[in-house]
Swiss-Prot record:
InterPro entries to which the protein is assigned, alphabetical: Allrgn_V5/Tpx1_CS, CAP_dom, CAP_sf, CRISP-related
GO MF term (any one): peptidase inhibitor activity
Sugar-modified residues: 37, 126
SCP domain mapped to chain residues: 73-213
Lineage: Eukaryota, Metazoa, Chordata, Craniata, Vertebrata
Residues of the signal peptide: 1-21
Protein family per UniProt: Belongs to the CRISP family.
One Gene Ontology cellular component annotation held by this UniProt entry: extracellular space
Function, in words: Serine protease inhibitor which displays weak inhibitory activity against trypsin. May play a role in facial patterning during embryonic development.
Keywords in alphabetical order: Developmental protein, Glycoprotein, Protease inhibitor, Secreted, Signal
Subcellular location: Secreted
Presence of keyword ATP-binding: no
Superkingdom: Eukaryota
Protein name in UniProt: Peptidase inhibitor 15-A
Length: 260
């Protein structure tokens, strides 16, 4: 079928070592492996590095616009603040430029799988790709949230994709990464890829989204959040601050400026 007449979203699912999954015509990818302190691989601790943000605009190639950045972040926080059953420890998510930079590096490869492997030990990751007419970044993000229809809190008992070459059946790990209470930082990148290989098919033009999360979520055997009165179990570092049912950090904006 003509690529220009058919828009296809693909979400790639990766559990533990790289299975992929296809949910109808909406593929997405989620990755979570054992976590380790980011300082072990040269990242700054959760203090949000800003060195990349200080590079002059003329020297910095961007893989995402500020509008797309805000749309992704606002959508995540909207979803996180409205989980059911309600969360007692849901943390407000902020944009992290260091995570965005790692997402840039992977998006630029146009490889339809999770990576790079050395970072997947430390980060959560959701992927989405689309061919055909592209209207909005949320076309690539909303399918992650759509998985909520197959999710039974606290564990994804109904999510059991079958993965020979492609994966079929309900999946939930993109959604659970979105609403993992302690995953309070996200950074994403979007790239236009030409002749991208997606499960054996070559897409002449594909829009590829990579989102990295920290601290990573999707720990096996754990629920994404604790149930209870919103903000009743926030970490002490939040000082009791609560906004839209989420533990709210002492920040002046809900994202880290890409350029200062």
């Amino acid at each position: 079928m003509n690529e220009n007449r058919l828009a296809i979203d693909i979400l790639l699912l990766c559990i533990s070592c790289g299975a992929s999954a296809l949910a109808g015509f909406s593929p997405t990818a989620s990755s979570s492996l054992p976590a380790t302190n980011l300082t072990d691989i040269g990242f700054a601790p959760p203090k949000y590095l800003t060195e990349a943000a200080n590079i002059p605009k003329t020297r910095r190639k961007r893989y995402i616009s500020q509008n797309d950045m805000l749309a992704i972040l606002d959508y995540h926080n909207k979803v996180r603040g409205k989980v059911f059953p309600p969360a007692s420890n849901m943390e407000y998510m902020v944009w992290d430029d260091t995570l965005a930079k790692t997402a840039e590096q992977w998006a630029s490869t146009c490889i339809w799988e999770h990576g790079p492997r050395n970072l997947l030990r430390f980060l959560g990751q959701n992927l989405s790709v689309r061919t055909g007419r592209y209207r909005s970044i949320l076309q690539l993000v909303k399918p992650w949230h759509d998985e909520v229809k197959d999710y039974s809190f606290p564990y994804p008992r109904d999510c059991n994709p079958r993965c020979p070459l492609k994966c079929y059946g309900p999946m939930c790990t993109h959604y659970t990464q979105m609403v993992w209470a302690t995953s309070n930082k996200v950074g994403c990148a979007i790239n236009t890829c030409h002749n991208m290989n997606v499960w054996g098919s070559v897409w002449k033009r594909a829009t590829y989204l990579v989102c990295n999360y920290s601290p990573k979520g999707n720990w096996i055997g754990e629920a994404p959040y604790k149930v209870g009165v919103p903000c009743s179990m926030c970490p002490p570092s939040y000082g009791g601050s609560c906004s839209n049912n989420m533990c709210f950090p002492a920040v002046n904006s809900n994202y880290l400026h890409w350029f200062k």
